Amino acid sequence: MEKIPVLVAGALGKMGSEVIKAIYKSNDCELVAAIDNANEMEGVDIGTALGMDQMDVAVTADLEGSLCVASQSVRNSSGNAVLIDFTHPNVVYEHSRASIAYGVHPVIGTTGLSIVQLEELREFANKASIGAAIIPNFSVGMVLLQQAAAAAASFYDYAELTESHHNQKADAPSGTCIKTAEIIEEIGKSFNKTTIKEQESIKGSRGGLRESGLRLHSVRLPGIVAQQQVLFGSPGETYLLSHNTIDRSAYMPGVLHTIRKVRHLKSLVYGLEKIL
């Protein structure tokens, strides 16, 4: 069976290293590039760097060179390579554009893209007829929470969202929290209407306010991987939806599923629910 060639950007990071371990254990994926800007690890076998068996793939900071090699090596194969990106909001947009330009399918797990950047990538991928996926959260459990939140939105007029992550996460609120809010807002109504004029003694105490009236709150602490809560309220009751990621291995089934699916797409999709 021909294996899917996969490049991982952010290979030495928390998520990138988990992805490489999942690829190593899979039967149908093959790591062809481990991209990271950790200069001290340049040229080191990624397997050795992660405390695994050697994988004959050296750590490199050269994204475009890796994309070029991958695009050339698969021209005579049955499908294009896939780039998995878990890097930083400052670089993920350029990484994605470069990947599409080389005919390599980008799967973006890095959050922090602006709405304008997302739409530009959608247009770029669609024009190139290259499948691409922007996935704020690869957890199937999170997809189920979002579906439950969308259903509850019909019955509750008050709702607030809280997301908690480790203190190394650069963007806030998280892409998952924003995506959840967008799914709730698809019902097309306003939330949290009040006749009271609120006054914050400390700016930001009430969280970020969206046009729909939904409020989003962010927590950053060591010891947390990822948590999200959606709290609905009405007179006499509250309804709490909660999801807690204990270990990053929970994301790997979703990552591998996306790798397999994205090569059959001709446009960009946003959200794991679009390809389940």
Swiss-Prot record:
EC number: 1.17.1.8
GO biological process, one term: lysine biosynthetic process via diaminopimelate
GO molecular function, one term: 4-hydroxy-tetrahydrodipicolinate reductase
Enzyme class: oxidoreductase
InterPro entries associated with the record: DapB_C (IPR022663), DapB_N (IPR000846), DapB_N_CS (IPR022664), DHDPR_bac (IPR023940), NAD(P)-bd_dom_sf (IPR036291)
UniProt main location, coarse: cytoplasm
Compartments where located: Cytoplasm
Entries under Pfam families matching the protein: DapB_C, DapB_N
Residues reported in the UniProt entry to bind (S)-2,3,4,5-tetrahydrodipicolinate: 166, 175-176
Entry GO CC: cytosol
Active site: 165, 169
Binding site for NAD(+): 10-15, 36, 109-111
Pathway(s) where this gene product acts: Amino-acid biosynthesis; L-lysine biosynthesis via DAP pathway; (S)-tetrahydrodipicolinate from L-aspartate: step 4/4
Reaction(s) the record says it catalyses: (S)-2,3,4,5-tetrahydrodipicolinate + NAD(+) + H2O = (2S,4S)-4-hydroxy-2,3,4,5-tetrahydrodipicolinate + NADH + H(+); (S)-2,3,4,5-tetrahydrodipicolinate + NADP(+) + H2O = (2S,4S)-4-hydroxy-2,3,4,5-tetrahydrodipicolinate + NADPH + H(+)
CDD domains per the UniProt record, alphabetical: DHDPR_N
Source domain of life: Bacteria
Record's keyword terms, sorted: Amino-acid biosynthesis, Cytoplasm, Diaminopimelate biosynthesis, Lysine biosynthesis, NAD, NADP, Oxidoreductase
Family under the similarity heading: Belongs to the DapB family.
Function noted in UniProt: Catalyzes the conversion of 4-hydroxy-tetrahydrodipicolinate (HTPA) to tetrahydrodipicolinate.
Protein name from the UniProt record: 4-hydroxy-tetrahydrodipicolinate reductase
Lineage, uppermost ranks: Bacteria, Bacillati, Cyanobacteriota, Cyanophyceae, Synechococcales
